[in-house]
Curated annotation (Swiss-Prot):
It is found in: Mitochondrion inner membrane. Component of the ubiquinol-cytochrome c reductase complex (complex III or cytochrome b-c1 complex) that is part of the mitochondrial respiratory chain. The b-c1 complex mediates electron transfer from ubiquinol to cytochrome c. Contributes to the generation of a proton gradient across the mitochondrial membrane that is then used for ATP synthesis. It comes from Neotamias bulleri. GO terms for molecular function: metal ion binding; ubiquinol-cytochrome-c reductase activity. This is Cytochrome b. A ubiquinone binds at H201.
């Protein structure tokens, strides 16, 4: 008699995805972030669901309802901070997952990569709308500033912004629709994740060497299930340390002040995971130019398969490309730091230089170095 997991229509899908899946024998801990992102998504959906049971999306009561969750709901403070800091863990895993893909050339799986970029954009949109919901000062002004950027679009800009706002400013209608979108998007993300996995399982996983590993595959279970469980335990440990010891470490104190349209905070800035893009936006003195640079800073990821000039897939055996990759990482850290600084000398010029370097490395330096390394192979 054949095992039920191999014959049952539903179990068969799970079996081929998580149990009998042939996986390369040499994938490192950098391949753990896919499962960690899955866990992050589950944590966010569950905590979000329980928060939504007590939250009210009305400008008069939104701030109070969040306070009520933290003070009066059983373990409400825990749920709220797990959700807020869970988003930070989500983005840490996302950035590491994307960085892994860039380093080891995983972007040559065209469909998987492009759906991944769409997923990144969807998660960023969800996080932005979630940040607006507590209706604190930074929520309100963040929503005002970021939605206002759409007014830079020629001809339809102003109409588009007012349509998104549902009025002539960020108000009750905006908050209500942001709550609705923030609730539905994670489920759309879940569906996209399934498509992401579908395309990944068409080709199989990449591995650190970037070489075809068909001749040396091992079953996913028990080897990588155990490895993933270790990663998940470490993720939960880090999340709970953050939640229980310093829940407001990554937040903004301004968001503990209720939203006031008559009082602008001295420094409007988004959550830490958007600061690199915010720095690129601010580094261009023109509104439309800044918005284009902001969008391109993420969409440029879609160009990686086209810009790949090397004869080798992975950077494992390409020291010059490795060097440039880590300079790019350092540049992103610099942009993140600049995004949180006020708009004054010397931060303006540092931000502009870091933004230029970001695009130059990706569009020019990495492809050129790859071609040079191809020449070195012939020596």
């Amino acid at each position: 008699m054949t095992n039920i997991r191999k014959t049952h229509p539903l179990m068969k899908i799970i079996n081929h995805s998580f149990i009998d899946l042939p996986a390369p024998s040499n994938i490192s801990a950098w391949w753990n972030f896919g499962s960690l992102l899955g866990i992050c998504l589950i944590i966010q959906i569950l905590t979000g669901l329980f928060l939504a049971m007590h939250y009210t999306s009305d400008t008069m009561t939104a701030f109070s309802s969040v306070t009520h969750i933290c003070r009066d709901v059983n373990y409400g403070w825990l749920i709220r901070y797990m959700h807020a800091n869970g988003a930070s863990m989500f983005f840490i895993c996302l950035f590491l997952h994307v960085g892994r893909g860039l380093y080891y050339g995983s972007y040559t799986y065209f469909e998987t990569w492009n759906i991944g970029v769409i997923l990144l954009l969807a998660v960023m949109a969800t996080a932005f709308m979630g940040y607006v919901l507590p209706w604190g000062q930074m929520s309100f002004w963040g929503a005002t500033v970021i939605t206002n950027l759409l007014s830079a679009i020629p001809y339809i800009g102003t109409t588009l912004v007012e349509w998104i706002w549902g009025g002539f400013s960020v108000d009750k209608a905006t908050l209500t629709r942001f709550f609705a979108f923030h609730f539905i998007l994670p489920f759309i993300i879940t569906a996209l994740v399934m498509v992401h996995l579908l395309f990944l399982h068409e080709t199989g996983s990449n591995n650190p060497s970037g070489l075809i590993s068909d001749s040396d595959k091992i079953p996913f279970h028990p080897y990588y299930t155990i490895k993933d469980i270790l990663g998940i335990l470490l993720l939960i440990l880090m999340l709970m340390i953050l939640v229980l010891f310093s829940p407001d470490l990554l937040g903004d104190p301004d968001n503990y002040t209720p939203a006031n349209p008559l009082n602008t905070p001295p420094h409007i800035k988004p959550e830490w995971y958007f600061l690199f893009a915010y720095a690129i936006l601010r580094s261009i003195p023109n509104k439309l130019g800044g918005v284009l640079a902001l969008v391109l800073s993420i969409l440029i990821l879609m160009l990686f398969p086209i810009l790949h000039m090397s004869k080798q897939r992975s950077m494992m055996f390409r020291p010059l490309s490795q060097c440039m990759f880590w300079i790019l990482v350092a540049d992103l850290f610099t942009l993140t730091w600049i995004g949180g600084q006020p708009v004054e000398y010397p931060f303006i010029i540092i931000g502009q230089l870091a933004s230029i370097l970001y695009f130059t490395i990706i569009l020019l330096i990495l492809p050129t170095i790859s071609l040079f390394e191809n020449k070195l192979l012939k020596w």
